[in-house]
């Protein structure tokens, strides 16, 4: 299926991307920064799942951003939509086969750190997988990666240092911490937020981890950035909605675009 998907994309474009980008909830507008050479709906790529979530357009963009050849997923997939981690990881395998060696992932998340605010960006230093499964479960294809990939540096330290430098130079507030992935689609209870915080997580979301595990399995370097869209403090918890989450994510897009653009400009 990977080969079929790669052939379908290559039939539409000859661009060989350096960098792959996955845009999460409310962040599709960042795709407007891409000088698009080719636009391919997911439904026209064999094996690609289809996005069913509001604000996930469901198309692959090939073009340039900040002087780099990029392939960008405008919309991603989630376990709560009924997809397995293997389904979610397949597009990453396609992006890597198209030529991308670096993966930039973004997401909207709930913030559990008491000193962080809505709209802040957080550099993902590490993650906790509470999805209950893993994209590498099942027979391993040694052509794609090792049976037991090391995850001690899932989020590349060099890319994180680069992002910190860009944020400092451009005056962008950039936190750094641990992302925990849960299945959703419901938001968490007060007790669950307390548990996740005790485990060492700073933010919580419903995506990203399957794609990152898949990318690391294939030898890609990964940079992850979360936008904190709601504050998940158990003792001061207020109801929120998807509409509010999307609005905060979109409000933070200029900062995310500036950060991503700066990182791309400085990549070796």
Summary of predicted features, one role per range:
Residues 144-155, 167, 181, 193, ...:
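Polyanion-binding loop/helix "lid" in catalytic or ligand-binding cores
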Residues 187-232:
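A C-terminal functional module that forms or caps the active site or interfaces directly
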Residues 1-151:
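Metabolite-binding pocket within alpha/beta catalytic cores that recognizes anionic/polar moieties
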Residues 232-268:
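His/Asp/Glu-rich mid-to-C-terminal helical/loop segments that flank catalytic regions of hydrolases
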Residues 80, 148, 152, 181-185, ...:
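Glycine- and other small-residue-rich loops at beta-strand/loop junctions that grip anionic moieties
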Residues 160, 165-202, 267:
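Active-site/ligand-binding-proximal alpha/beta "capping" segment
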Residues 17-21, 68-72, 101-104, 120-122, ...:
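Structural motif
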